[in-house]
């Protein structure tokens, strides 16, 4: 009697399984907020619309840092409207920094991918399906939105702020040579474990934090894909970029140059 031979397929790596079984993936959006009462309902509605139309499994985690304008009250209402399985409010008592906001949010995230973005409508959720497609095409560890590549751009800024932004990006390219076109942007998709590792390594605060994340990613040989995005100045509220932030950015840039 001929023996029966059972062929066994080789064990697939986690990354192969993620690429071949996209419906099993879940995307956790981290939304740090401070005085975003007017913007929050619209950005959440746009996120829900984009994910629902694309058939993407998601959750939105709102990390409010003690906003005095009632942002937390709005977030509580959104949690009731969309359900606590989709909208998770995880507030803190005061402003404690962007990096710690991400750490706090990730503690509650159940997705295997993390999306970070601004809550002020500067980043449109319509680009998220493109981020996900890009990640799958190249099996990237990180996908970053870029204002400085392809048809990406900035809208609503005056000439002064455009010059500051371009100048800052030019300096970072010259000094750090990161291999990515937009270091100061904050619209990105990460594998959850990659973001956890990067936050462990990063020491910067404020606007330099996002820049260091990309620099450290290159040091750790993580792969980075880019998607051109349109960045639009905030619809409601005042910009949080001022003179102190610019000085802090320059100090942080020089520190990274000296230590990386």
Swiss-Prot record:
Gene3D superfamilies per the UniProt record, alphabetical: Spore Coat Polysaccharide Biosynthesis Protein SpsA, Chain A (3.90.550.10)
Recorded metabolic or biological pathway in which this protein acts: Protein modification; protein glycosylation
Residues that, per the record, bind GDP-alpha-D-mannose: 32, 34, 36, 63, 65, 118-120, 147, 234, 240
Catalyzed chemical reaction(s): a di-trans,poly-cis-dolichyl phosphate + GDP-alpha-D-mannose = a di-trans,poly-cis-dolichyl beta-D-mannosyl phosphate + GDP
Positions bearing N-acetylalanine: 2
Entry keyword annotation includes Endoplasmic reticulum: yes
GO biological process: dolichol metabolic process; dolichol phosphate mannose biosynthetic process; dolichol-linked oligosaccharide biosynthetic process; GDP-mannose metabolic process; GPI anchor biosynthetic process; protein mannosylation; protein N-linked glycosylation via asparagine; protein O-linked mannosylation
Pfam family, one: Glycos_transf_2
Residue sites binding Mn(2+) per the record: 120
Subcellular location: Endoplasmic reticulum
Cofactors demanded by this protein: Mg(2+); Mn(2+); Ca(2+)
GO cellular-component term (any): membrane
Record keywords: Acetylation, Congenital disorder of glycosylation, Congenital muscular dystrophy, Disease variant, Dystroglycanopathy, Endoplasmic reticulum, Glycosyltransferase, Magnesium, Manganese, Metal-binding, Phosphoprotein, Transferase
Modified residues (Phosphoserine): 3, 9
CDD domains registered for this protein in UniProt: DPM1_like
The protein's Enzyme Commission number: 2.4.1.83
Domain of life, source organism: Eukaryota
Connected disease: Congenital disorder of glycosylation 1E: A form of congenital disorder of glycosylation, a multisystem disorder caused by a defect in glycoprotein biosynthesis and characterized by under-glycosylated serum glycoproteins. Congenital disorders of glycosylation result in a wide variety of clinical features, such as defects in the nervous system development, psychomotor retardation, dysmorphic features, hypotonia, coagulation disorders, and immunodeficiency.
Family stated for the protein in its record: Belongs to the glycosyltransferase 2 family.
Quaternary structure annotation from Swiss-Prot or TrEMBL: Component of the dolichol-phosphate mannose (DPM) synthase complex composed of DPM1, DPM2 and DPM3; within the complex, directly interacts with DPM3. This interaction stabilizes DPM1.
Protein name: Dolichol-phosphate mannosyltransferase subunit 1
Species name: Homo sapiens
Gene that this polypeptide is encoded by: DPM1
């Amino acid at each position: 009697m001929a023996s029966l031979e059972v062929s066994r397929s080789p064990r697939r790596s986690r990354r192969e399984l993620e690429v071949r079984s996209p419906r099993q993936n879940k995307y956790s959006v981290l939304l740090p907020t401070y005085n975003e009462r007017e913007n929050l309902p619209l950005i959440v509605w746009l996120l829900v619309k984009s994910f629902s139309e694309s058939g993407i499994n998601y959750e939105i985690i709102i990390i409010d840092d003690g906003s005095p304008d009632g942002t937390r009250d709005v977030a509580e209402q959104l949690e009731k409207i969309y359900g606590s399985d989709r909208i998770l409010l995880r507030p803190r008592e005061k402003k404690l920094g962007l990096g710690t906001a991400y750490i706090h949010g990730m503690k509650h995230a159940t997705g295997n991918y993390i999306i970070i973005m601004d809550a002020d409508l500067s980043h449109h959720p319509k680009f998220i399906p493109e981020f996900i497609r890009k990640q799958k095409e190249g099996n990237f560890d990180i996908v970053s939105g870029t204002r400085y590549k392809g048809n990406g751009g900035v809208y609503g800024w005056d000439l002064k702020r455009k010059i500051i932004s371009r100048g800052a990006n030019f300096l970072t390219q010259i000094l750090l040579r990161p291999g990515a076109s937009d270091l100061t942007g904050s619209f990105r998709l990460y594998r959850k474990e990659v973001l956890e590792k990067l936050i462990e390594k990063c020491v910067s605060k404020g606007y330099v934090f996002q820049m260091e994340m990309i620099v450290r990613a290159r040091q750790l040989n993580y792969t980075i894909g880019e998607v051109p995005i349109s960045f639009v100045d905030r619809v409601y509220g005042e910009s949080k970029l001022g003179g102190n932030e610019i000085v802090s950015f320059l100090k942080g840039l020089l520190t990274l140059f000296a230590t990386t």
